[in-house]
From Swiss-Prot:
Gene3D superfamilies tied to this protein: DsrEFH-like
Pfam families cross-referenced by the UniProt entry: DsrE
Function: Not known. Could be involved in the oxidation of intracellular sulfur.
Gene symbol of the encoding locus: dsrF
Family per record: Belongs to the DsrF/TusC family.
Protein name according to UniProt: Intracellular sulfur oxidation protein DsrF
Domain of life where this protein originates: Bacteria
SUPFAM superfamilies (alphabetical): DsrEFH-like
InterPro entries hit by this protein: DsrEFH-like (IPR027396), Sulphur_relay_DsrE/F-like (IPR003787), Sulphur_relay_TusC/DsrF (IPR017462)
Length: 136
């Protein structure tokens, strides 16, 4: 009997700190990947701040978990998207975001940055292709 692989999309809409949504979303993404599900992560609205470089949480007394995002590729989370309109509305560009890289262990091919900035039409396509969409 073969295992059923579901396509899970995780929408990250909240700022990285101030609530537990961003941290919990990251945990759920890693759990989905650990169970070999087809995981897609989309950052939109204030969620785009989760991927910004140089986060410093000393002043707010919270643990900075942003370095964990850079390891997503190593956990076989290879479909990572950022909504272009959300970036532009916040005065950000892809250059402001962390790079998520990984090495394919089978082919030894290296991928420098798998974060893809997409438009709203592509966001809709990805949602329609997903078996389940979780919003945080």
């Amino acid at each position: 009997m073969s295992e059923v692989v579901k396509k899970f999309m995780y929408l990250n809409r909240k700022a990285p700190y101030g609530t537990i949504y961003a941290w919990e979303a990251l945990e759920v993404v890693l759990i989905g990947a650990a169970f070999d599900q087809d995981v897609c992560v989309l950052f939109l609205d204030d969620g785009v701040y989760q991927l910004t470089r140089g986060q410093d949480t000393k002043g707010i007394g919270m643990k900075n978990f942003s370095p964990t995002y850079r390891t997503l590729g190593d956990y076989e989370v290879r479909r990572i998207y950022v909504d272009r309109d959300s970036l532009e509305a916040r005065g950000l560009t892809q250059d402001d975001l962390v790079e998520i890289a990984f090495e394919d262990m089978e082919t030894e091919e290296e991928f420098d940055n798998i974060v893809e900035v997409i438009d709203s039409a592509r966001v809709s396509e990805l949602m329609n292709e997903s078996d389940a969409v979780f919003s945080f």
